[in-house]
């Protein structure tokens, strides 16, 4: 995940990362502190204040979700090459690429060399964005042709396109959507029986189905 610095920041502690306005930072961990992200810039790593940067989100980044949930989501997307990138549950700051092979979901651990570059095989990249762009036109698999493809546009859920929150919900990771009781959420996907994907006030994320009630608008 990449971000752009909105302001310059001078580190005051040894574990902080200084940067200038306009710098592009690689975000390594967004989960462990609500006010600080761990990031990398030109080979140096450290913590940065989240209100000093703007994330460059992508629909393929799913945050810290489980391997099982990744498989459930991708197998319901009925085309080979559907993919997502998730953060490791056990090792924050490490990532995996999960890819629909048509008959199964394959998981690739994203490796990093001593200089901080990302790689799966021989080719190395400065960011996850570059890695994804490369494997859109080069097969990610060794024994078959599998190219990363964005999700095909899905029709909005029939009839009930909106849901009303019955309880407050606080997101546990960036892939989830927080809301308050009474909020009206636009439902974008219902691919998983337990977790839906929706939009509220410009924010998009997953939320528990049991917390909402479909409504007709």
Curated annotation (Swiss-Prot):
Membrane-related topology note = Peripheral membrane protein
Keyword Oxidoreductase attached? no
GO CC aspect terms: COP9 signalosome; cytoplasm; nucleoplasm; plasma membrane; presynapse
Which lineage do the record's taxonomy fields give for this organism? Answer: Eukaryota, Metazoa, Chordata, Craniata, Vertebrata
Pfam families for the chain: SH2, SH3_1
Q: Which family does it belong to?
A: Belongs to the GRB2/sem-5/DRK family.
Q: Which GO terms describe its molecular function?
A: epidermal growth factor receptor binding; phosphotyrosine residue binding
InterPro entries given for it?
A: GRAP_N_SH3, Grb2-like, SH2, SH2_dom_sf, SH3-like_dom_sf, SH3_domain
Q: Where is this protein primarily located? A: membrane
Annotated compartments? Membrane; Synapse
Q: Where is the SH2 domain?
A: 60-152
Q: What is this protein called?
A: GRB2-related adapter protein
SMART domains (alphabetical): SH2, SH3
Q: What does this protein do?
A: Couples signals from receptor and cytoplasmic tyrosine kinases to the Ras signaling pathway. Plays a role in the inner ear and in hearing.
- Domain SH3 as annotated: residue spans: 1-58, 158-217
Its BP terms in the Gene Ontology are: regulation of MAPK cascade; sensory perception of sound; signal transduction
Q: Which domain of life is it from?
A: Eukaryota
Keyword set, alphabetical order: Membrane, Repeat, SH2 domain, SH3 domain, Synapse
The subunit structure is: Associates through its SH2 domain with ligand-activated receptors for stem cell factor (KIT) and erythropoietin (EPOR). Also forms a stable complex with the Bcr-Abl oncoprotein. GRAP is associated with the Ras guanine nucleotide exchange factor SOS1, primarily through its N-terminal SH3 domain. Interacts with phosphorylated LAT upon TCR activation. Interacts with SHB.
């Amino acid at each position: 995940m990449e971000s752009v610095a909105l302001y310059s920041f001078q580190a005051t502690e040894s574990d902080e990362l200084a940067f200038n306005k306009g710098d592009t930072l690689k975000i390594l961990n967004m989960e462990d502190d609500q006010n600080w992200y761990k990031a990398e810039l030109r080979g140096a790593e450290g913590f940065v204040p989240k209100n000093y940067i703007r994330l460059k989100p992508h629909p393929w980044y799913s945050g810290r979700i489980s391997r099982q949930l990744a498989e459930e989501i991708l197998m319901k997307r009925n085309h080979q090459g559907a993919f997502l990138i998730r953060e490791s549950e056990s090792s924050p700051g490490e990532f995996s690429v999960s890819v629909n092979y048509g008959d199964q979901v394959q998981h690739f651990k994203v490796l990093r060399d001593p200089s901080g570059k990302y790689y799966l095989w021989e080719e190395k990249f400065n960011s996850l964005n570059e890695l994804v762009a490369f494997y859109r036109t080069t097969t990610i698999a060794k024994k078959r042709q599998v190219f990363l493809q964005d999700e095909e546009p899905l029709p909005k859920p029939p009839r009930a396109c909106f849901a009303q929150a019955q309880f407050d919900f606080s997101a546990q990771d960036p892939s989830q959507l927080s809301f308050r009781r009474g909020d009206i959420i636009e439902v974008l996907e219902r691919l998983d029986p337990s977790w839906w994907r929706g939009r509220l006030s410009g924010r998009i994320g997953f939320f528990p189905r049991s917390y909402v009630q479909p409504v007709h608008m």
